[in-house]
Amino acid sequence: MDHMISENGETSAEGSICGYDSLHQLLSANLKPELYQEVNRLLLGRNCGRSLEQIVLPESAKALSSKHDFDLQAASFSADKEQMRNPRVVRVGLIQNSIALPTTAPFSDQTRGIFDKLKPIIDAAGVAGVNILCLQEAWTMPFAFCTRERRWCEFAEPVDGESTKFLQELAKKYNMVIVSPILERDIDHGEVLWNTAVIIGNNGNIIGKHRKNHIPRVGDFNESTYYMEGDTGHPVFETVFGKIAVNICYGRHHPLNWLAFGLNGAEIVFNPSATVGELSEPMWPIEARNAAIANSYFVGSINRVGTEVFPNPFTSGDGKPQHNDFGHFYGSSHFSAPDASCTPSLSRYKDGLLISDMDLNLCRQYKDKWGFRMTARYEVYADLLAKYIKPDFKPQVVSDPLLHKNST
């Protein structure tokens, strides 16, 4: 089923799993409590030997969720108590959302509609005391890059453009760092477009930006029609609340991309995305969780929701009939921790805000426990990669000398 946007911009409750918001809700409703508890242990892991604790949120945040009909969930990751360090607890939020108006509406109305839709969700994060908030990939617009039509470039804006100004006021109001992934137009370099995350500080200042490292060329995701691979490396942004990084969408499929943010000292890595069910849903709960484990940091995974229908049909280069939509963006935003625990996912079809308290001491504790940094062989990997990028590279393959001998 798909979550459709009607001509008046209203959304229907399609896109569920057999009528349930998420896999976790389906299992909870249909398994005996003792069975669900065991399944939950295997699906979500254990944080410091126990299930994640629920956070009691202010009534004002709950009221905003009820009034504006968005999913609101909150859970807490703890760490072991240490003698030499105090807990370093930070409250982090993720927002997933559908577009506000049909893609046929005037572009300025579409953007303003999304601003208006997100304002109460950001307010809920603010009154709930969120310190760092991340929005979804290209949150100011429909994910129109499947169409290959140039007119969607009009949604691009400078780093200090309209969306940043909108969020700067909220960042100051709530003393909140906000990660804002946008379609950037680089005014100083020939007005080239980039897929960019703008990091807005809790004082309303622009801390910096990161441009998407890996650009997909898979099915409808032919984004290189609009922008190419980023040029910002793997920056980690030191904020008053902790060290954060942004691995934008398709970068989650590249383990070395995750590794690089970890080597630069990230404690939380956000993965703002736009991905659809048929293509990637079985991979979604695995990749970020694996990255959190392998790199000893927290990961926040965000995916938009809904089915965005475009005016003109397009093809995918796979011989299948032309169509007017990507498919269903399945939401399911969640957090993963370095100890292999993770939160239940947000709804598969509703707008949502996921809040988590994280004790960042857990990052070092799991570096010490597993010793992945200590036991890694970076010099060996570096030597192989240095050889691999040369034209005369020869794979290190040892063949059986009898491999091609005729059998008797």
UniProtKB/Swiss-Prot annotation:
Record flagged with keyword Hydrolase: yes
Keyword list, A-Z: Cytoplasm, Hydrolase
Record-annotated CN hydrolase domain positions: 90-360
Family, as annotated: Belongs to the carbon-nitrogen hydrolase superfamily. BUP family.
Gene Ontology terms, MF aspect: beta-ureidopropionase activity
Induction: Up-regulated by nitrogen limitation.
Location (main, coarse): cytoplasm
Domain of life according to the entry: Eukaryota
Pathway this chain belongs to: Amino-acid biosynthesis; beta-alanine biosynthesis
InterPro entries: Aliph_Amidase/BUP, C-N_Hydrolase, C-N_Hydrolase_sf
Catalytic residues of the enzyme: 137 (proton acceptor), 212 (proton donor), 249 (nucleophile)
EC main group: hydrolase
Subunit details: Homodimer, homotetramer, homooctamer; can also form higher homooligomers.
Gene Ontology cellular component terms for the protein in this record: cytosol
Function text: Catalyzes a late step in pyrimidine degradation. Converts N-carbamoyl-beta-aminoisobutyrate and N-carbamoyl-beta-alanine (3-ureidopropanoate) to, respectively, beta-aminoisobutyrate and beta-alanine, ammonia and carbon dioxide. Involved in the recycling of nitrogen from nucleobases to general nitrogen metabolism.
Gene of this entry: PYD3
Phenotype when the gene is knocked out: No visible phenotype, but unable to grow on uracil as sole nitrogen source.
UniProt keyword annotation of Transcription present: no
Name listed for the protein in its UniProt record: Beta-ureidopropionase
